[in-house]
Amino acid sequence: KINYYAVFLLPPEMLVLFKPNILFLSEHSVDPDKRRYAVPDEGPRHYIDMDHYGTYPYPSVPRKWNEAVAKYGEDSLKKQGIVPWHIQWMLQRLTNAFKTKNYSLIMKYSAEIGHYIADAHVPLHACSNHNGQYTNQRGIHGFWESRVPELLAEKEFDFFIGKAAYIQYPGDFIWNRVLESARAADTVLSTERELSLLFTDDKKYAFEERNARLNDAVGQEKTIRQYSTAFTIAYNKKLGGMVERRMRQSI
C-alpha cells in the first residue's frame, strides 16, 4: 500500500504518468522480496545491521559507498547489509530511466525503490537482531511489519499526508531515516518484552485460519499461531503509534 498512497502525493505533471499504473506499482513492489531466494546479492539490499558498527549515531560508518568500501571492504559491507547505499543506486537508475524516457524501466524502478525505502523505515531492518533471534522473541519482525498494519492500518492509520516535497539531498535523507530506524530498534524489542509480562501465552497468541501459499494446495487453508488482536492493539498503543508514523514517513 505504500506505493499506492505515494502516487497521490505526486504533482499533476507526474500523476498523469503514474496514476494509470498504480496497480502495477503496488503489485510489483514485492518483486525485490521475490528475488531474495533466487539472487544471492539481493538479501543485503534490504537491511543494514547498524549495531555492528557501534552505537548511535554510528560516526564510524562512512556515508559514501566508496569510502565505506575503502574502510571495511565490499564483502564485509554486504554481510552487514547495504540498504542506504542501494536506495541511492536505485535512485540513479530511476533518474536515468527518466532521462532516456524508458517508461518500462521507470515503472520497474519506481515500484522497487518504494520497497527498499519502506524497508529502511523498519527498525528491525537496521538491527542485527532482526527477528528477535538473540532475545527469544522470534516472530517480532513480522509482528511489527505485517501483523500490526494488517489489523490496524485500514481502519485506524491515516496515509493521506499532503503533497510530495522535493528532497535536495537524498543521500543525507535516507541515512537519517536509517539512523532513526536503528535508534528505534531497541524500543520495538523492549516494548514487546515488557508487554509479554502482562499477557499469558493463551492471551498473547491466537490460532487463525489462513489461505495456503506457495507449495500448499491451492485454496487450502492452514491454521497458524499468530499474535492475538488484543496483544497487537496493546503493543501498537504502547509504541505510541510508531508503526503508523514510520509507514507515513516511508510514503
Cite the ranges covered by each PLM segment.
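Short active-site segment of divalent metal-dependent hydrolases/proteases
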Residues: 118, 124
